[in-house]
A protein has these predicted regions:
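Glycine-rich phosphate/diphosphate-binding loop of Rossmann-like nucleotide-binding domains
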Residues: 1-13, 65, 79-158
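A glycine-rich helix N-cap at a beta->alpha junction
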Residues: 40, 46, 69-70, 120-126
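Gly/Ser/Thr-rich loops at beta-strand to alpha-helix junctions
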Residues: 47-54, 75-76, 106-111
Length: 158
């Protein structure tokens, strides 16, 4: 996957990219390895890291490093989803603050999509997120800290 993306980086942005893979499933080992390489690179594009490790790894690297860190699975997907919503609003003559959005899924990409969509002006109460169990609502006790930031209303109000 990253070899192809490296070609796109070069073709469309004239950015030289190198595909590096680390043989570890430990978040702290991964973070330390990437941080050690910082002086050699102008940016880091993370790929195929599952939640919740992707949130921890990306935030830790952003905090510790002086170069951009981008998790493609989260933010690349969110950018495309946001562009689609902006275009849909333009085509239907709606204001983004008036639309209601349902996000079906609650993985890293879905959470990043919801966060970006809200930052564009969709009110928190107009966004509903569902995972494999159902609607993520305020007070639901089986969600992690990232999912728990997403609910808009108590379940009984739905």
């Amino acid at each position: 996957v990253m070899e192809g993306k490296a070609v796109l980086f070069k073709r469309f942005a004239d950015v030289d990219a190198i595909d590096l893979e680390l043989d570890t499933e430990d978040a702290e080992t991964f973070i330390n390895a990437v941080q050690i390489m910082e002086p050699s690179f102008g940016g880091i594009n993370l790929e195929d890291i599952a939640a919740p490790d992707c949130f921890i790894i990306e935030q830790t690297l952003r905090d510790r490093m002086n170069i951009p860190v981008f998790h493609d699975d989260q933010h690349g997907t969110a950018i495309i989803a946001a562009a689609g919503i902006i275009n849909a609003c333009l085509l239907t003559d709606r204001k983004i603050e008036d639309i209601k959005v349902v996000v079906n899924g609650a993985g890293a990409a879905a959470i990043a999509c919801a966060s970006l969509i809200k930052s564009l002006g969709v009110p928190h109460d107009n966004l509903t997120m569902c995972d494999r169990t159902g609607v993520i609502y305020r007070g639901r006790d089986d969600v992690d800290q990232w999912k728990s930031a997403m609910p808009s209303t108590p379940m009984r109000a739905r």
